[in-house]
Design a protein with these regions (language model features):
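Active-site cofactor/substrate anionic-group-binding motifs, chiefly glycine-
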Residues: 1-2
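A conserved beta-strand/loop element that lines the FAD pocket in flavoprotein oxidoreductases
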Residues: 134-149
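Extracytoplasmic/periplasmic beta-strand context in beta-sandwich domains
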Residues: 8, 60-62, 145
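Residues at the C-termini of beta-strands that transition into short coil/loop
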Residues: 14, 96, 145
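Glycine-rich active-site loop/strand segments that organize a redox cofactor
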Residues: 5-35
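Rossmann-like flavin
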Residues: 23-133
């Protein structure tokens, strides 16, 4: 299968975002989270505006505690930290094993965090659609160009 960066994930967060935002004042940290969380919706707006069909689907993301109790402890601690930042269940919500089982069957799971701030797209269709959109704006694209420096 494809890696995350090539598999069509359009995430409204960054790995380690809490560390990246930690040095900011609280209101700026919250603004940073809001900016990140808005990424999938902003992309959807551009897709609509430019008429790009790339199989966009905003279904959210699950961070699962699938195998070990320690995974559940880590996820719950992460969720606690997110709530301490002022985020709430509309951003990140704990799913019990029974709730998780309604979406994804993982035998013996310990639960999961669900965030709605994620979508999937078909990357090649997105790239082709964006290329057509910027060409309409007068941008010249050069494919298969040799890099000299």
């Amino acid at each position: 299968g494809a890696s995350g960066r090539n598999g069509g994930w359009l995430m409204g967060n960054l790995l380690g975002e809490d560390g990246l935002l930690a040095g900011l004042p609280p209101e700026r940290r919250r603004a940073g989270y809001d900016l990140l969380h808005g990424i999938p919706d902003e992309v959807a707006r551009v897709l609509q505006e430019e008429g790009i069909d790339c199989d966009y689907r905003k279904g959210g993301v699950l961070y699962c505690a699938a195998r070990y109790p320690e995974q559940e402890r880590r996820l719950r601690a992460y969720l606690h930290d997110l709530y301490a930042e002022g985020l709430d269940e509309s951003d990140y919500r704990w799913l019990t094993p029974q709730e998780l089982d309604q979406q994804l069957r993982i035998p013996g799971s310990y639960g999961a965090i669900h965030s709605p701030h994620c979508a999937t797209i078909q990357p090649a269709r997105l790239a082709r659609g964006l290329a057509r959109a910027v060409e309409r704006l007068g941008v010249r694209l050069f494919e298969k160009s040799r890099v000299l420096h």
